[in-house]
Amino acid sequence: MQLNFTMSELLHSDIGEKYNISNIPDKKALDNMLLLIVNCLQPLREYIGKPMIITSGYRSTRLNGHPLVNGAPNSEHLTGCAADFTVKGLTPKQIVELVKKSGIPFRQCINEHNIWTHISYNKDDNRKQVLFIP
């Protein structure tokens, strides 16, 4: 299987770089990120047939709590289980519909503000919950 995603994509943060916030995951988060890529992101990329632009992946506690990130205290980004992304030429609503049709395992797929799509994978709980945050 050829992977179209790298760990560095899931670790990159413009806010982290600008404000010098460390974003180094522990081994468990790295393991979760690999599971997210192999079981969810890569199969979805192949199903959609277009590049997915990761806008947020893993977040350290400090990065997640930064006012410009404003992440939820229980965010799955903290454990390496989630990624936010966009796909050129597709709306988040269209992406969510494709995710639902794909049969790919996921815990949550969220259309966030009609700007980006959040997807998470948890090897023990892939309930396929779909949400819309206006």
Can you say where each PLM-predicted feature lies in the sequence?
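Catalytic cores and adjacent binding grooves of peptidoglycan-active enzymes
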Residues: P73-N74, T79-P134
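Extended, low-complexity, intrinsically disordered C-terminal regulatory tails
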Residues: V38-N70
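A glycine-rich, hydrophobic loop/mini-helix early in the fold
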Residues: I24, K28, R62, A72
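Extracytoplasmic cell-surface/polysaccharide-interacting catalytic and binding patches
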Residues: M1-Y47, I133-P134
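Amphipathic alpha-helical interface surfaces
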Residues: M33, I37-C40, K50, C81, ...
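Solvent-exposed, flexible loop/coil residues
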Residues: E9, D14, R62, P67, ...
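N-terminal start-of-chain detector that recognizes signal peptides
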Residues: P25-D26, I53-R59, G89-Q94
